């Protein structure tokens, strides 16, 4: 961060969702609707808000010219705020040992003008690849020195499924499991006519549990008004 150039409080930070994989980095841009592997970019002087998680092994996200190191961990989200004040191409890496492909787990960060960033986004949108749950499950398989890859669109809610470890069909998300516990666990499930754990192990029953929890939450919100 520049010592002489204060941040403009009226500028909306650029959100970048970061997923550490074996052994590559996935970057998702919810505002722009794109995603990239082993490459990301941001406009100069625009604050960046990183949200980070991991798929299996803890890693450490580090761009020495941008900001300090921060860990990315499975089932958890960490956050980092940063800004780049000078155009250029910078090296990013995993600074925490994470297995066989650790040494090649690097990426490029491009600090661009506003026009250059818009052009970079448009280039990604022309790649024609779609990042949905199926293509994500292929991407997440371990690979070393993965080439830069760009996705023109991203399935809604994908990052939240990654964070809650439920990208696979039929797998209940962590936040739904926690909601069940908060509602009373097995006693609550029996009250609404479901038995744990067997009834939650199918796609249909998992969806039913979530629907019941959503209904309970909406009723509670109405009661509080």
Where are these regions (language model features)?
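Non-transmembrane, membrane-proximal soluble domains of secreted or membrane proteins
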Residues: 1-225
């Amino acid at each position: 961060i520049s010592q002489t150039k204060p941040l403009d409080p009226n500028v909306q930070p650029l959100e970048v969702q970061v997923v550490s994989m074996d052994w590559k980095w996935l970057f998702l841009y919810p505002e722009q609707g794109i995603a990239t592997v082993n490459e990301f970019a941001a406009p100069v002087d625009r604050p960046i808000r990183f949200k980070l998680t991991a798929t299996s092994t803890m890693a450490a996200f580090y761009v020495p010219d941008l900001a300090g190191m921060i860990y990315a961990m499975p089932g958890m989200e960490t956050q980092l705020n940063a800004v780049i004040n000078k155009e250029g191409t910078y090296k990013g890496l995993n600074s925490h040992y994470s297995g066989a492909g650790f040494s090649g787990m690097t990426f490029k960060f491009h600090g661009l003008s506003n026009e250059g960033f818009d052009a970079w986004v448009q280039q990604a949108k022309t790649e024609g690849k779609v990042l949905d749950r199926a293509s994500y499950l292929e991407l997440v398989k371990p690979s070393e020195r993965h080439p830069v890859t760009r996705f023109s669109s991203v399935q809604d809610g994908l990052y939240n499924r990654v964070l809650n470890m439920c990208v696979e069909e039929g797998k209940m998300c962590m936040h739904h499991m926690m909601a069940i516990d908060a509602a009373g666990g097995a006693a609550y499930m029996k009250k609404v006519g479901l038995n744990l754990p067997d009834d939650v192990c199918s796609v249909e029953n998992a969806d039913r549990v979530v629907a019941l929890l959503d209904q309970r939450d909406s009723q509670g919100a109405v009661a509080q008004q």
